[in-house]
Design a protein with these regions (language model features):
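Intrinsic-disorder-associated, low-complexity terminal segments enriched in Asp/Asn/His/Tyr and depleted
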Residues: 2-5
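Bacterial N-terminal signal peptides
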Residues: 27-37
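Hydrophobic targeting/anchoring helices
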Residues: 43-150, 159, 398
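Extracellular ligand-binding/catalytic regions of CAZymes and related secreted enzymes
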Residues: 44-86, 364-443
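Helical hinge/lid and interdomain linker segments adjacent to catalytic or ligand-binding clefts
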Residues: 45-46, 51-55, 85-86, 90-95, ...
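Catalytic beta-strand/loop cores that center a nucleophilic Ser/Cys/Thr
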Residues: 150, 157, 254, 273, ...
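Catalytic cores of eukaryotic secretory-pathway lumenal/extracellular enzymes that build
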Residues: 261, 270-272, 281-282
Length: 443
């Protein structure tokens, strides 16, 4: 048809009909989407209980992460049955729960509304938090380390939560901006190689680690490992200042804080860096640069397996395994939502576990730090949290929550034997924390 032979009015009418048809099509699509949304709202939901009824607490976090990865937002019901997850009842999600052995319940919409009403009651210490986007996770760990060398990588692997390994080179090169959440392997950020010199200086693994660290420092343009670790520490601090989430355990806590406080002073003896430490090192510490601690004394002796007076390992060692527990604080879910998220658990009393840094003496914790778990009888904190700039950080004392006295060379913990570990749950609370759409803290 030659469009030039069609009267202009007909063309106009034809265009109007086409536009009308397109509008009707779009309208019908919106109506259909609305109907589907209505049906989804009216449909049943999938509840992943996190109380004693849950068979696989640790893998349940993996299900939550998997759901977010696949674009399905879920709700974290804080303090409801141990911090349960409420998800859309999607066949693929229930199938994944079954495959991983995670306990779930199908609840009708009316029942879900009752749960919401219970949580909304101002007299009830519960809250709903929407989880929206799976955080990008980085683990700062030396190349060649196995997952069982570190509790966090071990539980991430068990829970089937993906992560990327990075180390000094990547941090120095500015790659932290790619991630939302960073865990520090049980590292020594002071440049003293973990203070293992006294006992292991002749061990092949120790000598290899020293050599690898020195080679990396040289390749990155640093004359000493301590200088490289100092810059790594500063870059991590900038990551938190810019909105990142930092989680670290064991010696990655106090050694990191000390490295920040010693930013402008040499605290390493000659066996570590080839020159003596500053004799005025203690007086030159700048505690304000650290995240959590102040007024402690550093221990420079290479033969002493300790960084400072912060650590409460000796006190916990005297207490003994049978009596070593720490208690989680009970926070207001509607007012102090951040520590509430980080302390979700199915028990409030958790068995202790040793590490190079086991716990933190209360005397050295800054006043603006939130203590979330403590052993009151010893005056020590196990689990602490704080804010810096736009970001957040969490320190957790001890090495392995299911191995009371983990020693160098010990076999890995089999988490299949500890699927409900309360101590490991605290790690995974931190993993999901960046995914939460948080309300502004009111206290």
């Amino acid at each position: 048809v030659n469009i030039a032979n069609i009267p202009g009015g007909c063309i106009l009418e034809s265009m109007k009909i086409t536009i009308f048809a397109t509008q009707m099509k779009n309208t019908l699509a919106l109506i259909l989407l609305a109907l589907l949304s209505f049906q989804t709202t009216r449909a049943s939901q999938l509840l992943i209980p996190m109380d004693e009824q849950q068979a696989e607490h640790l893998k349940a976090y993996g299900i939550a992460y998997w759901s977010l990865q696949n674009g399905v937002p879920i709700e974290w019901l804080l303090n409801y049955r141990g911090g349960s997850f409420l998800c859309p009842n999607i066949p693929t999600l229930s199938k994944e729960c079954t495959i991983r052995g995670v306990t779930f319940e199908i609840v009708a919409d009316a029942q879900a509304q009752q749960i919401y009403a219970q949580i909304a009651d101002p007299e009830v210490n519960m809250e709903r938090v929407k989880l929206e986007v799976a955080p990008k996770i980085a683990v700062y760990t030396p190349k060649g380390k196995q997952p069982w060398d570190d509790a966090v990588t071990m539980v991430l692997t068990y829970a089937e939560i993906p992560y990327t390994e990075i180390y000094d080179t990547e941090v120095i090169q500015g790659e932290l901006v790619k991630y939302d959440w960073l865990h520090l392997h049980h590292e020594d950020f002071t440049g003293q190689y973990g203070k293992f010199y006294g006992q292991y200086r002749n061990a092949a693994w120790y000598q290899e680690e020293v050599s690898n660290q020195q080679n990396t420092a040289s390749a990155l343009g640093f004359s000493k490992v301590s200088e490289m670790k100092r810059q790594v520490s500063i870059n991590i601090r900038n990551f938190v200042l810019g909105g990142g989430f930092l989680f670290t355990m064991c010696s990655g806590t106090d050694s990191y804080d000390i490295a920040l406080a010693a930013e402008n002073v040499d605290i390493c003896e000659s066996v570590f860096d080839g020159d003596p430490s500053d004799p005025q090192a203690q007086q030159k510490l700048q505690f304000q640069n650290g995240f959590a601690f102040q007024d402690y004394r550093i221990i420079k002796d290479p033969m002493t397996y300790e960084f400072s007076t912060i650590d409460a390992t000796e006190e916990h060692n005297r207490m003994g395994e049978i009596n070593d527990f720490f208690t989680l604080f009970d926070f207001s879910a509607k007012w102090d939502i951040v520590p509430t998220i980080l302390t979700q658990n199915h028990t409030q009393v958790i068995k202790g576990f040793m590490g190079q840094t086991t716990a933190f003496k209360n005397d050295y914790i800054k006043s603006n730090v939130t203590v979330m778990g403590q052993t009151k009888s010893l005056g020590s904190a196990r689990y602490i949290h704080g804010e810096l700039g736009q970001g957040q950080w969490t320190y957790y004392g001890g090495h392995d929550p299911e191995d009371y006295r983990h020693l160098v060379g010990d076999p890995p913990t089999d988490l299949a034997l500890h699927p409900n570990s309360p101590g490991y749950r605290l790690i995974l609370n931190n993993i999901l924390f960046p995914a939460a759409k948080r309300k502004k803290q009111k206290t």
